[in-house]
Structure formats: structure tokens, C-alpha cells
Amino acid sequence: MRIAMVSYEVYPFAKVGGLADVVGALPKYLERQNINVDIYMPYHKKVKQNAEKYGWAIEKITEKVDASMLRTEEKFEIYKTMLPGTKEVNVFLINNEYYFNADEVYAGPDLAEQAIFFSYSVIEAIRKLNFEYDIVHVNDWQTALIPVYLKTVFRDDPLLSKIATVLTIHNLGYQGIFEPEYLRFAGLPDYLYNIDGIEFYGKINFLKGGIIFSDIINTVSPTYAKEIQQKEYGEKLEGVLRARSSDLYGILNGIDYEEFNPLTDNKIYVNYDLNTIEKKKENKKLLQKELGLPERDVPMFGMINRLVDQKGLDIMAEIMDYVSLFDIQFVLLGTGEEKYENMFKKLGEKYPEKYSINLKFDIVLAQKIYAGCDMFLMPSRYEPCGLGQMYSLRYGTIPIVRYTGGLADTVKEYNPETKEGNGFGFEGFDPAHLLKAMARAIYFYNSKEDWNTLIKNAMTMDLSWDKSAKEYVKLYQRAKSKVQR
């Protein structure tokens, strides 16, 4: 089976969020299942900078190609490289100086035109290279028009008509909603502008188009796949998603066990595994030392997040004065809304012996937090999958979460009688429930037997991409069978 995977960001070439981690890791594990994968992404300015920095070999494989159907004079070139850590996963880079020359990945002169240009260019690239794919796997709204093109404009194309499509929704909150005139720029038929097409409250919705026209849709956790069919989480697309419920699946993201391994991780202070778990305490002491916190055996909470409402910062704000009364330490890493940055700054200034506030992005410090902290906080309002809790489990750092989306699928409440469970959580999105979950974690931290059991349960979970890749193979087979009928 041959797959074309399409994404705006791919680790290590360009990374903004979790999407890059997914598309950077999944092909590696699909390759081990004997699936042939090619990746298509924009040749962002960031990719060019990283290529120069890390010395990646990137070759130009075509001269300029017309985007003939679009209302633009712009053309594109195709470059090629390899995904590190794979035998033959090719990465095809769509180059255009006008659309992909911004300093940031999700920036440019016109985000709608940019997404249309990229989506159309990927299809033209497949035609130019004459590759026969079984599946085109697209990710999020930026690439969601590809299934629309394939099922309308290119439905009779001999090379493209047999391709099945899979759309992965990583976060339904981002949909690509724009003015209707972009339909003309895209060269898509006018009849799509209706309630059963991509019309959306007087505008057009790229993600809605992908949901309607893809053969199979999936989200990044089973719970989130159910949640988005409800009004509370559906972002006004719950009806469209319910209409496709028989083709909607949830597959948990995995984590790259080679990249995130406390036994071999060169970013942490001291390597360890379950058999040498006492060395985790050395990581804690060295983290305290680096951050200027007193070297004390008290519960240390870690949090690595964008500081925004979605991540539960609004309910955290209401309890931090109470939390400050506990004999604990708290390490924050992240940036975001000014009101939350200011709140944490003030806490750090008021309680320097308890709070280490790091308002930045630092991949090395992140690993040290996963390894050195005792507990990891993720009180999210909603969380399609979440990777932070998986990294923390892998490093034996016990998650405290709100049971939503992927957090509900990966974290199970600890039961001291059965000794089952790997963390603590709460369901109602309010400050009192969060505070109680934190208090339960502190209580069991003081019971050495229970805490060691929690660490063991956490570190023996299978959160690898191997498991998830097998689920994606089944998904591809389902999509393929729909086209072959």
C-alpha cells in the first residue's frame, strides 16, 4: 500500500505544535508495517533555515510547475529529501517564494490562498511525478480541500480517481473559515456553495469540505471522536460529523519511544528506567538546583503548556493562592496570554522558594521537567489527544488531568485497593475539582508503596506509535475498500 501524507508541519523540518510530531513519527512506524509512505509539505522558510543549520540533503527535482486551475500566476517547484530515521520515506517540499516565505509556518500574505495553493499543488505534484497512491492522508483544515478536489474536479482523472482519502482532525477548533469568493480562486465548482457542501453560515469552511468529501475521517483519540459529535465540543460542525459517524474513528496518537526514553535521553541529567527508578530523584534534585529551588523532598508539579484558556488556565487562576499554602514546588514552562504570564510571574516573585516560572519555549528544559518532576498538570477544557501526559507517563511522572479527549483515554484514576491506575483526574471543569485531584495526588505521594505502584503502572503502559500505526493501517484498508466498491 502506498500513502501520500500531507501536512503543513513535519518534525524535524518545521514544528509549531503536536501535528509536526505526529507526521514526523507515524510514517516511520508505518514503514515498519511495510507501508510505503511519502510526505508532502510546504518548503517553508523555516525548513530552509533548518536545512542549512543541520545540513540536510535537499534536491530540486522539477522546474516550475503551473497551478493552472487557480486564479494566480504563481508556480511551484518540487524539492525532495528523506525523513530522518527511515529507510525510504521521501519528503516532497512544495516551493513557492510568495506563499511560503514567511518567518513562521502559519503566516503569509493570505492564509486562505496559501492553503488553496498548497492543496492544489500537491495534486499537481502527484500528477507530475506520476505516482500511483492508494491513499492520500490529509491533516487539518490547511489540507482539507484535497479530498474536495479529488472528488469533484479530478474525479475522472485516470491517475487520481482511484485514490481514497483520509482526513485527520487534530483540533476541531481550527476550521479555515473564509469569504465565499475563495471558491472561485480555488477553481472549485459553484455548486459546492450550499449547506450540503462547504458553505458555512455565509462563508466557506475548508474543514467542513474535508469532512464531507473524505472517505474516512479520524480524530486523535477515541473519546474526542465521540465528544465532537456533541454540541459542547462540536464547534458548530457536530451535525456534519454525526452525519458521517459511520466513517468517523478515533485513534490515539503515540509517542516516539526512541526519542522519548528516560534510559537514553541525552537531554536529561541522569538516565534511568523502571529498574533504576531511584535515579529519578537525582533528576529532581538537579532540576531544583538549576532552577534555584530549595532541594527538598516535597511534591514537585510540572506544567508545560501554551498559557491559554483551552489548557485550563482560567480554573487554575482561581486556586493558585490555595495551592501556594501546600508544601509543594511548581515548575512552569510555556508562553501565552499576557494575563496568565503576569499571574505566574507574580506567583514566582511572591513565592520564589515554591515557584519556578519559565516563560519561554525550551525543548531541553521540557525533557528535564518530564524527568525531574513528580506530577504533571493538564487541567484542559478540551484536549483532542494531548502528548504531555504521555511523555510524563513514559518518564514516571504522574499526570493530573481533566478527563476529556485523549486525557480520558490515557490516564486512569488510581485505586489504592486494586493498585490499578496511573494518575489522577476530574470531570467537572471547575477549580474545586482540580484542587481535589491535586490534593489526592499529594496524599498518595506521601505513601511510598502507592507512589511506587503509580510509577510502575505509568512506565509500563504501551503508548508507542507501533500500536497506533497498526490502527492506521486498518483505517487505510477501510478507506481503500470504500473506493473499490
From Swiss-Prot:
Q: What's the Enzyme Commission number for this chain?
A: 2.4.1.21
Pathway field? Glycan biosynthesis; glycogen biosynthesis
Record keywords: Transferase included?
A: yes
What processes does the entry annotate via GO biological process terms? glycogen biosynthetic process
Q: Which top-level group of life is the source organism from?
A: Bacteria
Catalyzed reactions per annotation:
[(1->4)-alpha-D-glucosyl](n) + ADP-alpha-D-glucose = [(1->4)-alpha-D-glucosyl](n+1) + ADP + H(+)
Keywords assigned: Glycogen biosynthesis, Glycosyltransferase, Transferase
**Gene Ontology terms, MF aspect:** alpha-1,4-glucan glucosyltransferase (ADP-glucose donor) activity; alpha-1,4-glucan glucosyltransferase (UDP-glucose donor) activity
Binding-site list for ADP-alpha-D-glucose: K15
Q: Has UniProt tagged this entry with the keyword Transmembrane helix? A: no
* InterPro entries in the cross-refs: Glyco_trans_1, GS/SS, Starch_synth_cat_dom
- Family (UniProt): Belongs to the glycosyltransferase 1 family. Bacterial/plant glycogen synthase subfamily.
| Function according to Swiss-Prot or TrEMBL | Synthesizes alpha-1,4-glucan chains using ADP-glucose.
Its recorded name reads Glycogen synthase
Q: Name the source organism.
A: Fervidobacterium nodosum (strain ATCC 35602 / DSM 5306 / Rt17-B1)
